[in-house]
């Protein structure tokens, strides 16, 4: 083994099952070593995954050492056998990189080679994520005599979408007798919604005579065939009533420079024989045309198109429970319709209805509060005070959120951030079960080894797995034990988003602030919580470092003003990072005349961008409503950042009144520089 890699692998007795692993290799060296593993290490076997570079200092006597070594290699590569992935994932649920390893496991299955029993066991715990995965499950079930289950899985594979041509042939050779004409039509429809035209061309001959003409027209549209206009001319009502045809026709119109025609068609309710099989594609179709209309200043048309969201779902569908991509397009449409009605069309009642749909579709407290707050504002504009009060009450339930805090002010009260304290008894058995989870043991082992970066991955996994109030409390205790306030933030957010209680104290941990910066105590916490979640070793994709995420160049320029010597290696030291971050923020506050909104925006986007926005958007300190100014910030990241930091500051002030930056009956409005509540 090359001495250049500086790697020493030291295996203890196989009987004990312990793996001694000492590593001092760079990531590049570690990757090189993975590539040098012998072929035998890549073959499936009923044993743990091959040993590989793990956390540098985890003790070989620590029970977490061996699984950490396995996790380290499996998460870095795709070249290992299915059994390696499956055995690890079955034994170590909720570990980091689970989704990545699940996908690799599905790709690694070798039909006729890998154990059918292991394949079935794996998919029972981790359901297939792709049509190919369903096919592998079907083949495994057929191999062990589970014929009915195999036929169902094969049908899911066939109707689920895209398969390779080889897998298409494998499925048809084994299961074609179990597939009906309806199954073939369903697959064709799915492929067309996916815009998978090559696979759809292969599928066309399997479709039923009744549906084939419509599929031929849709395929011609999606491929922009020369005869597409002729086929359109002969498309009869059964075809034109198909939502798949409508979506493909709109796509073709936009693709051939006829977007205006598409808008005119979409602005009116279209008769359809069914609801679209792909709400996501349907909503995206509406969104593109509505946005095009808005860009051209056609606000009534933009509203008309965006308000057709009801065509995407069967009545009564809980949009909040639909996949993110669907919810995202749906809320974009309702927001566009609502703001067009309120700000452009002088139709506040219609705006209130759209804001209400937006709030009801939203999953996160942040988005729900935003929708309810603006629904309240729209109801007020429409003269409906009772409906406005109820909307503000709905928003005020989210007292740690920007718009929930504004709603509380509208109702004449302070945001209630202390109401959810709970005391859930934890039994010794519950505590022992939690602490003995392999993901918790691994997280603690990495902490003992001083491996902060990899421990951070486990911190996130533990936070995401919290599902009960008891687990919430235990995870919060673990955060304190491990010295990981970022785990507290993540656990608290997950508890909030999952509807659990008592998250406020957990989600807003406290850190030590240098005495000279105590006057900025709340805003320091507010920025650090948003920037790094209090992860002192955080490094952003652009190189910002530490609690307050300082770019090295900014830190270098700020150090003399803070009375400090610049040292890049110290940016991960909390006190040093806070001193520089607080000094830089103080300079921004001075530069912008004490405006928290502008200083916070500049901390995120830079003073140059903020100065440009002051020229193009107006000045929220003078001639522009501050809420409208924030909504008009062209960078979505900065728009979100300003709201999150200021809502954090309000919570920290309320939870720690002796250290509050702002003491007011309208705290958020005070931070915003507004003269009116809410």
Give the role of each language-model region.
Residues 109, 141, 191, 220, ...:
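Residue at a conserved register position within TPR or TPR-like alpha-solenoid repeats
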Residues 56, 81-89, 115-125, 149-158, ...:
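Alpha-helical repeat scaffolds
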Residues 15-27:
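Bacterial N-terminal signal peptides
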Residues 39-43, 60-68, 78-82, 93-103, ...:
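Generic helix N-cap/helix-start motif at coil->alpha-helix transitions
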Residues 74, 90, 98, 102-110, ...:
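Alpha-helical adaptor scaffolds
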Residues 93-94, 127, 142-143, 147-163, ...:
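TPR/TPR-like (Sel1-like) alpha-helical repeat modules
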Residues 31-79, 417-438, 448:
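N-terminal leader/linker segments that initiate helical-solenoid repeat arrays
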Residues 85-91, 261, 273-282, 296-309, ...:
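Catalytic glycan-binding domains that act on GlcNAc-containing polysaccharides
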């Amino acid at each position: 083994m090359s001495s250049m890699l500086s790697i020493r692998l030291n295996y203890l007795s196989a009987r004990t099952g312990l793996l001694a692993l000492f590593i001092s290799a760079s990531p590049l060296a570690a990757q090189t070593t993975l590539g040098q593993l012998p072929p035998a290490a890549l073959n499936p076997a009923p044993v743990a995954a091959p040993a590989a570079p793990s956390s540098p200092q985890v003790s070989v006597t620590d029970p977490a050492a061996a699984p950490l070594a396995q996790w380290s290699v499996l998460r870095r590569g795709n070249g290992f056998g299915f059994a390696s992935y499956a055995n690890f994932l079955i034994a170590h649920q909720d570990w980091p990189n689970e989704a990545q390893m699940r996908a690799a496991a599905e790709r690694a299955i070798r039909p006729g080679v890998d154990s059918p029993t292991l394949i079935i066991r794996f998919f029972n715990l981790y359901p297939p994520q792709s049509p190919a995965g369903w096919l592998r499950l079907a083949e495994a079930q057929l191999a062990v005599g589970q014929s009915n289950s195999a036929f169902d899985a094969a049908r899911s594979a066939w109707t689920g979408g895209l398969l390779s041509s080889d897998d298409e042939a494998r499925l048809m050779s084994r299961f074609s007798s179990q597939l009906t004409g309806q199954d073939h039509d369903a697959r064709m429809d799915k492929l067309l919604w996916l815009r998978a035209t090559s696979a759809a061309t292969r599928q066309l001959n399997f479709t039923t005579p009744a549906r084939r003409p419509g599929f031929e027209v849709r395929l011609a549209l999606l491929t922009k065939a020369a005869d597409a206009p002729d086929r359109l001319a002969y498309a009869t009502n059964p075809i034109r009533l198909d939502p798949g045809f409508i979506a493909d026709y709109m796509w073709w119109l936009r693709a051939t420079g006829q977007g205006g025609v598409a808008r005119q068609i979409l602005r009116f309710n279209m008769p359809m024989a069914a609801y679209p099989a792909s709400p996501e594609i349907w909503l995206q179709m509406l969104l593109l045309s509505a946005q095009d209309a808005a860009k051209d200043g056609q606000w009534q048309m933009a509203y008309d198109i965006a308000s057709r969201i009801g065509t995407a779902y069967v009545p009564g569908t809980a949009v909040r429970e639909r996949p993110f991509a669907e919810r995202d397009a749906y809320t974009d449409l309702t927001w566009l319709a609502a703001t067009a009605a309120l700000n452009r069309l002088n139709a506040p009642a219609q705006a209130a209805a759209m804001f209400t749909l937006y709030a009801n579709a939203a999953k996160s407290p942040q988005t729900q509060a935003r929708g309810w707050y603006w629904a309240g504002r729209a109801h007020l504009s429409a003269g409906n005070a009772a409906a406005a009060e109820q909307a503000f009450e709905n928003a005020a339930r989210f007292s740690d959120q920007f718009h929930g805090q504004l709603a509380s002010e509208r109702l004449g009260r302070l945001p209630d951030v202390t109401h959810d304290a709970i005391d859930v008894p934890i039994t010794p058995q519950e505590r022992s079960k939690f602490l003995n989870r392999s993901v918790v043991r691994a997280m603690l082992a990495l902490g003992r080894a001083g491996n902060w970066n990899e421990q951070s991955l486990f911190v996130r996994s533990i936070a995401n797995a919290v599902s009960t109030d008891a687990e919430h409390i235990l995870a919060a205790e673990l955060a304190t034990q491990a010295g990981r306030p970022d785990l507290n933030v993540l656990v608290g957010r997950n508890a909030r988003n999952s509807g659990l209680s008592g998250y406020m104290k957990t989600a807003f941990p406290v850190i030590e602030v240098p005495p000279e910066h105590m006057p900025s105590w709340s805003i320091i916490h507010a920025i650090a919580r948003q920037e790094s979640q209090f992860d002192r070793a955080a490094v952003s994709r652009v190189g910002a470092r530490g609690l307050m995420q300082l770019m090295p160049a900014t830190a270098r320029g700020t150090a003399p003003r803070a009375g400090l010597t610049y040292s890049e290696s110290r940016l991960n030291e909390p006190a040093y990072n806070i001193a520089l971050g607080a000094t830089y923020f103080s300079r921004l506050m001075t530069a912008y005349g004490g405006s928290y909104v502008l200083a916070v925006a500049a901390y995120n986007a830079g003073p140059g961008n903020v100065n440009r926005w002051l020229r193009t958007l107006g000045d929220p300190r003078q001639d522009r409503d501050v809420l409208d100014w924030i909504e008009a910030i062209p960078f979505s990241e900065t728009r979100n950042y300003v709201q999150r930091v200021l809502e954090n500051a309000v919570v920290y002030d309320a939870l720690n009144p002796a250290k509050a930056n702002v003491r007011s009956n309208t705290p958020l409005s005070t931070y915003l520089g507004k003269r009116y509540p809410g």
